[in-house]
Amino acid sequence: LSVMKLIDSPGKIKEGSIIFDGKDITNYTENQMSNIRGNEIAMIFQDTMTSLNPVFKIKDQMVEVIERHQKLGKHKATERALDMLRLVGIPEPERRINSYPHEFSGGMRQRAMIATALSCSPKLLIADEPTTALDVTIQAQILDIMRDISVKTGTSIILITHDLGVIAETCNDLIVMYGGMPMEMGSVEDIFANPQHPYSQGLLKSVPRMDREQK
């Protein structure tokens, strides 16, 4: 939320900087940020049931974002929305785009959220626990989609998660956080193989391993 400058009052950014595309966006006005949010920086929130408006169809919510940032008419924006639904693997997109969020399964809602977030081809996608409420099969599908889209579109992804398995499968670089502060950072391979901070070591030791002898 800090990156998007969406912290509710009285919360505020007291110090530091957020450099995006070579510029410190902490100094941006609300008008400047509104042009970036959903356009250059997009976010997938953890709870899809509350992130999607239950009284509007998927089409209405996707088209609004595309019209706002891409300056397209409704017809072109709808075509773009359909293309994105196809990209994330939603079957029968021409029919499902007219569904309400409650008519989608958890995995389908997450796909719709990803499609909406990527509809304006952002440079950065922030994914906050995008697979937490999903079973392992759907989780794997969602992670595959995110990886493929990152490769195809060049979108960078910041993945916020507590799941070390997801990190190992998906990420290149890792920052271990505790109490809102970075404890350790480096490549996933380096930290998993040789964690330096006690908190990182504790996290990795907490993961059950089949190759570890039980005492």
Write out the residue ranges for each language-model feature.
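Short catalytic/signature loops enriched in Gly
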Residues: 10, 91-95, 187-215
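Conserved ABC transporter NBD signature motif
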Residues: 13-24
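Conserved ABC ATPase "signature" region
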Residues: 23-24, 64, 76-95, 204-205
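ABC ATPase NBD coupling module
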Residues: 25-42, 60, 68, 190-195
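A short, proline-enriched helix->beta-strand linker immediately N-terminal to the Walker B motif
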Residues: 119-123
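A short, surface-exposed alpha-helical micro-motif characterized by mixed small hydrophobic
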Residues: 167-169
